[in-house]
């Protein structure tokens, strides 16, 4: 009887630890799916944000920095893509970072987004319009 309780306690403890995630596990640098950029995810107040911290090709062929030329807000189109905040306003809820948005500097479009942890070094980033079923998911890996 005591042996069964010990096993049950162990299994209960183990299952809770496996399925619970710390809200700050997402913090750090992540390599995007294309391998073109590192995104630094950080906490600002109670929300999570992400900015482009490194780019494989940060400059144009003429040596000038790549700019956010496709931004629909003309006052922002002269900003450098390096350092650009592309993930905004995420909150942690039910093991998912949600309620935020992702900006794509290649198209100048912003999408609703949610992020889920797939392991200590992998996240799935899902951008969508309207319903999350209508979107695209990318896997990002942690930069070590």
Q: What are the roles of these predicted feature ranges?
A:
Residues 1-7:
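Bacterial N-terminal signal peptides that target proteins for export
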Residues 27, 35, 42-103, 110-111:
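Central antiparallel beta-sheet cores of small beta-barrel/beta-sandwich binding domains
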Residues 32-34, 102-106, 127-131:
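Short acidic, glycine-rich loop/turn motifs
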Residues 43, 92, 117-118, 142:
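Generic beta-strand structural signal
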């Amino acid at each position: 009887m005591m042996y069964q309780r010990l096993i049950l306690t162990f299994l209960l403890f183990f299952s809770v630890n496996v399925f619970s995630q710390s809200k700050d596990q997402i913090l750090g640098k992540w390599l995007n799916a294309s391998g073109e950029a590192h995104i630094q995810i950080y906490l600002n107040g109670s929300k999570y944000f992400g900015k482009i911290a490194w780019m494989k090709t940060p400059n144009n062929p003429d040596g000038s920095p790549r700019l956010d030329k496709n931004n629909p807000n003309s006052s922002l189109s002269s900003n450098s893509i390096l350092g650009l905040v592309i993930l905004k306003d995420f909150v942690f809820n039910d093991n998912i970072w949600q309620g935020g948005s992702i900006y794509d500097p290649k198209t100048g479009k912003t999408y609703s987004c949610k992020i889920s942890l797939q392991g200590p070094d992998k996240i799935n980033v899902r951008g969508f319009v309207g319903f999350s079923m209508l979107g695209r998911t990318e896997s990002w890996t942690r930069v070590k």
